[in-house]
Amino acid sequence: MQNIIAKVIEREGGDKLTKDPSDPGGTTKYGISQRANPDVDVENLTLQQAIDIYKEKYWHPSRAVDFPKHLMDMYFDMCVNFGQFKAVKIVQEAVNHKSKNTLKVDGRIGPKTLAAVQNLELNRLKSFRVTHYAKICMANKKLMKYYYGWFRRTMHI
């Protein structure tokens, strides 16, 4: 868990404070955005506070620990980037693409999803993640400037 959280923080730019007006998350530090965490003083956030937020808000609820080792980092990164509900839906869609719609795409981690992900290939999940980014950019052209970075982030996991 600690190692995966550290990787996410690194991918998110570490302690660099960003205030990009076109970023839907608003002010961000350690990957913790003001919009997703309105009760947090993001500008004065410490590394330990960020780690604690990742553990409580993302790691434990995501059940990433129940994913196969080869998918754990990718899945957790998706939960941070998209939110758990959307991340799970993307995982379920990737599973269904290969298994002919055996899972209900409901954004919930249940026993069927956990069993099905055991056979999901990392590259298949990467392709569904990149496709989701493309859909985001098609819906909001202003976010296109982030696409290459999102693509690169996905491919390096």
Task: Map each language-model feature to its residues.
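Cell-wall polysaccharide-cleaving catalytic domain and substrate-binding groove, primarily
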Residues: M1-I157
